[in-house]
Regions:
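C-terminal catalytic/substrate-binding lobe primarily of soluble NAD(P)-dependent oxidoreductases
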Residues: 172-421
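N-terminal Rossmann NAD(P)H-binding glycine-rich loop of SDR-like oxidoreductase domains
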Residues: 7-26
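Conserved Rossmann-fold cofactor-binding substructure of NAD(P)-dependent oxidoreductases
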Residues: 69-80
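Beta-loop-alpha module in the N-terminal Rossmann-like domain of NAD(P)-dependent dehydrogenases
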Residues: 73-74, 86-101, 117
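Rossmann-fold cofactor-recognition segment
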Residues: 57-71
Length: 421
């Protein structure tokens, strides 16, 4: 079966795609996931797809450049023409139709996050696209435990992705600390809060134009999320809307060893975790880099944005990205677990810490997808131990800590509005 693999990487010239390819080429854990000699088809809309000699020596690499996929028929033709049986998609394109095409053709499919057709963000922004889209995808294609003609894993990046697996590990760890069954612990959960602190800085800050929007991951996607007309979280299995833009809605929450003040960003993982654990309140709080926050007020229109991806090829980066999850119960205390990665660690893969984290989730999901997987799933329904073992080979050990009472989350009623103007 391994020798018959023909893997397509869609979005190979983007930030995640490049990080993923460099991890494939350099990290030994990839050898047990995508074997040497596998046919690897790299696809992107740019004209020149650049890869390392290491990757070419390891895999039978071919290129399809200058490709624009704007409909389900475009994807279908591409998969059939090149006899693809595994699609790894990191291009931020339409999720629902991609799933339907892949399941109809029997192609294994994994993506790093929920996406829409390229013109949708610009057309519908600033409608509450992310949470609405996550609900649509959940209702259309996620049926927990249902068999499929082929395997599909949705949202296997960092968040969503690794953080979803951390929820399952954290529940077990906190249950063990309290000497109770994990189901009893899960029933007592009050909050599952995904937290991120990105301290990225440029030592000698470049002169950016007012239209520039610098950040460590997809700038268009990030800007769209931060400036939606409303934000929200999930409680009792339903989305609770807040009539405030994400960038104006801030909360204090613990993230590893400190309490951060971050913005409430609508995100996929809150929807699927909120469905699996309907008794909890779940959301994503993100402390964005200062350099990003300074440029948010300068660009008001998504169509006018000049995206600036902060990667070591173009900038000298300082700082780190910490991403994890806070599990807070009513009776059994609180627990935080996640990863902190510095940019200098990621430079080994010619990427930044944020994109290295996302690529680690892509590879971890791929490892499970290729193990005779035959259902449509999200990461919290996978074997979290196997998944996180792969992640740790790339990102290092998980940081875990019990949370003191003075660091507990106090709920989404305690918001700070109007911080970024």
């Amino acid at each position: 079966m391994e020798s018959l693999l023909k893997v397509m990487l869609l979005g190979s010239s983007g930030g995640i795609g490049r990080a993923f390819m460099n991890i494939l080429a350099q990290n030994d854990i990839s050898n047990s996931i995508i074997p040497h000699g596998t046919k690897l088809v790299l696809v992107d809309r740019c004209k020149d797809i650049v890869v390392s000699d290491q990757l070419k020596k390891k895999y039978a690499v071919s290129f399809i450049s200058d490709v624009n996929i704007s409909s389900h028929s475009d994807l279908e033709k591409l998969l059939i023409q090149h006899q693809i049986n595994v699609l790894i998609e990191v291009a931020d394109i339409e999720t629902i139709e991609f799933v339907r095409v892949c399941t109809s053709l029997g192609v294994l499919y994994l993506n790093s996050g929920y996406g829409v057709w390229p013109d949708v963000y610009a057309r519908e922004h600033p409608r509450c696209l992310m949470l609405v889209r996550a609900l649509e995808i959940r209702n259309a294609i996620i049926n927990r435990g249902a068999k499929s003609s082929t395997g599909v894993i949705l949202g296997s990046g960092m968040n969503p992705g690794i953080v979803n697996a951390l929820v399952e590990r954290g529940i077990q760890r906190l249950a063990n600390l309290n000497f109770i069954d994990k189901n009893e612990l899960a029933a007592d959960l009050k909050y599952i809060i995904f937290t991120e602190e990105d301290t990225t800085a440029i030592p000698t800050e470049s002169k950016f134009n007012d239209s520039d929007f610098p950040i460590t991951w997809n700038p268009q996607h990030a800007f769209a999320e931060f400036t939606e007309q409303s934000t929200g979280y999930v409680s009792q299995g339903r989305v609770q809307w807040i009539n405030s833009r994400p960038l104006d809605c801030k909360f204090d929450v613990v993230c590893n060893d400190k309490v951060i003040n971050g913005i409430l960003v609508p995100h996929e993982e809150a929807v699927t975790i909120g469905e699996k654990y309907p008794n909890v309140t779940s959301g994503f709080i993100y402390s964005i880099p200062d350099i990003t926050a300074r440029h948010l007020p300068k660009v008001r229109n998504l169509k006018l944005i000049n995206p600036v991806l902060l990667v070591p090829k173009n900038f000298e980066l300082d700082g780190y990205d910490t991403v994890g999850v806070l599990l807070q119960t009513t009776r059994y205390g609180a627990y935080w677990l996640g990863y902190r990665n510095y940019h200098h660690e990621a430079a080994h893969y010619d990427t930044n810490a944020t994109l290295m984290q996302v690529a680690a989730g892509v590879l971890a999901g791929t490892g499970i997808l290729l193990r005779q997987f035959s259902r449509i799933s999200v990461v919290e329904d996978l074997d979290h131990q196997i998944y996180l073992d792969t992640v740790c080979h790339i990102l290092g050990p998980i940081v875990e800590r019990q949370i003191m009472t003075d660091q507990l989350f106090h709920g989404f009623e305690h918001q700070r509005v109007g911080i970024i103007r």
